[in-house]
């Protein structure tokens, strides 16, 4: 069975991506990164998802990006903006995060003898991140094949981003068909330790709107019980 490294954050998109990789016949090796994010509950979610989808191995790496990559997601003293209050690239952008994570996935893939990496980025219904676009994924894939021993030896590495052109509604529908329990996932930028969501940030808004568009009950646990 072919091996694939799957970046697994603990959110909806990465969980769906893992399920797609598994459905595609890959033995999945999940990689989750503790980069100093304030919503650390997503790492517990990643562990639950990995167990639920029976990954072959699941590695958790600690890499404190707060030292070099300042963002409201890594600075607990900063305020996460409410949905609709940011313009341009949002303050929740973590500099070079996806590049760093893909590089780590690439290193593990080489060790495993894997030629496939999966990442759950999407360019539709997203919050304006520059590293969630198809041209970025294509550029990283080109670099990976230029900069690795496997690439130099003619073993082409592919970076799969199966959700990149899908709106959240279709992502949710796809995941439901694959049997994902989205109640295991955490999307909120300021989820508490128990995984309860704020219901007010961009991530919460996009998630909730996706379930509404898919006409599927939202399994998210919100701190404010009036949000549903």
Swiss-Prot record:
SUPFAM superfamilies: Adenine nucleotide alpha hydrolases-like. Binds 1 zinc ion per subunit. Pathway: Purine metabolism; 7-cyano-7-deazaguanine biosynthesis. It catalyses: 7-carboxy-7-deazaguanine + NH4(+) + ATP = 7-cyano-7-deazaguanine + ADP + phosphate + H2O + H(+). Catalyzes the ATP-dependent conversion of 7-carboxy-7-deazaguanine (CDG) to 7-cyano-7-deazaguanine (preQ(0)). ATP binds at residues 8-18. Zn(2+) binds at residues 188, 198, 201, 204. It comes from Nitrosomonas europaea (strain ATCC 19718 / CIP 103999 / KCTC 2705 / NBRC 14298). InterPro entries: QueC (IPR018317), Rossmann-like_a/b/a_fold (IPR014729). One of its GO terms (biological process) is queuosine biosynthetic process. This is 7-cyano-7-deazaguanine synthase. It comes from the Bacteria. GO terms for molecular function: ATP binding; ligase activity, forming carbon-nitrogen bonds; zinc ion binding. Its EC number is 6.3.4.20. The gene is queC. Its cofactor is Zn(2+). Belongs to the QueC family. Pfam families: QueC (PF06508). Keywords: ATP-binding, Ligase, Metal-binding, Nucleotide-binding, Queuosine biosynthesis, Zinc.
């Amino acid at each position: 069975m072919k091996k694939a490294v799957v970046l697994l954050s603990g959110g909806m998109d990465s969980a769906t991506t893992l399920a797609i990789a598994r459905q595609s016949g890959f033995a999945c090796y999940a990689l989750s990164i503790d980069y100093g994010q304030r919503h650390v509950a997503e790492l517990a979610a990643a562990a639950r998802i990995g167990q639920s989808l029976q990954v072959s191995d699941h590695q958790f790496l600690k890499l404190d990006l707060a030292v070099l990559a300042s963002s409201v997601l890594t600075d607990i003293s900063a305020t996460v903006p409410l949905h609709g209050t940011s313009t341009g690239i949002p303050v929740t952008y973590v500099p070079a995060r996806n590049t760093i994570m893909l590089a780590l996935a690439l290193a593990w893939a080489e060790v495993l003898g894997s030629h496939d990496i999966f990442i759950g980025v999407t360019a539709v219904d997203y919050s304006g991140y520059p590293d969630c676009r198809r041209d970025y994924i294509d550029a990283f894939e080109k670099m990976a094949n230029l900069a690795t021993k496997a690439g130099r030896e003619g073993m082409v590495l592919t970076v799969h981003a199966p959700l990149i052109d899908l709106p959240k509604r279709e992502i949710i529908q796809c995941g439901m068909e694959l049997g994902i329990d989205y109640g295991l996932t955490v999307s909120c930028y300021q989820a508490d330790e128990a995984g309860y969501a704020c219901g007010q940030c961009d991530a919460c808004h996009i998630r909730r709107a996706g379930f509404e568009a898919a006409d599927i009950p939202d399994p998210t646990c919100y701190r404010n019980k009036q949000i549903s």
